[in-house]
Amino acid sequence: MNRLIVSTCLGLAFLGLHLDSHAGRYALMPDQVIDGVQETAQVDVAVLVEDARIASLVAKSDIPAGYERIDLQGMTLMPGMINAHEHPLLYDDNYQTAHLTASSAYKALLGLAVMQRWLAHGWTTIRVMGDGDVFYGNQDLQRVFSEGVFVGPRITGAAHYISITGGGGDINYGSPEQTLIADGLIADGPIEIRKAIRTEIKYGSDWIKLLVTGAFHSVGDDPRNVAFSPDELAEAVAEAARHNVPVAAHAHATEGI
């Protein structure tokens, strides 16, 4: 069963790339279709595609003339999957040092390969929840995908985490004499939080990510502690709302959640 699912996702993903680059009319004929609406998979159904977009589902016996028939025997068609929490540019397990050892361009190129691999496995939408990048590599990838320069999944999300000084998005392992650039945006107080959110939106983030508590993999903070004050959180949500941008929160422990 696992082999069937993997083969199906791979086959359909690459089929999708083919159809996307060859506008026309196709009738996809799998063994069954999961449409996300019916409670059970549908059999004897074809998916009609026009100009790289799904037009309708019809019985295989009712496929209109003029459609190129593509036999997908042994496969199941289903909607693309959504990964709602991902960090595509974290190429190293130690996310607190990875951004110091590679450029934003290098990580974007690695992210391109990663996202194309995810697309081939059936993930058609990726929500980025901050990443190990001091610039905006994911937003650049989103741009080249939307412009058709490269084929990749849809990207939404936040370029960075917004963290307090000493929080989960800060670098807390250096001595006071060292100046290290954090991969998060460090903001303290309503004014700095407002500016950080405006900066994120300016450069393409369509979500805001707040590190409301400490994290497990960062040095010098505690996942049980709430980082932002109520006033800071209220300002963050209000500022994002002014731009019609949703807010996501990293939160551990009862009080943080």
Range-by-range predicted roles:
Residues 140, 191-257:
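Histidine/acidic residue-rich metal-binding segments in metalloenzymes
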Residues 1-8:
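Bacterial N-terminal signal peptides that target proteins for export
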Residues 112-137, 152-161, 205-218, 246:
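Divalent metal-dependent hydrolysis catalytic cores, especially in the metallo-beta-lactamase
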Residues 81, 143-169:
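Glycine-rich, aromatic-flanked loop segments that form ligand/cofactor-binding clefts
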Residues 24-26, 33, 37-78:
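Histidine-rich, glycine-flanked metal-binding segment
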Residues 75-143, 147, 231, 255:
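Metal-associated gating/positioning segment near the N- to mid-region
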Residues 97-109, 175-195, 246-251:
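Active-site mouth loops of central-metabolism enzymes
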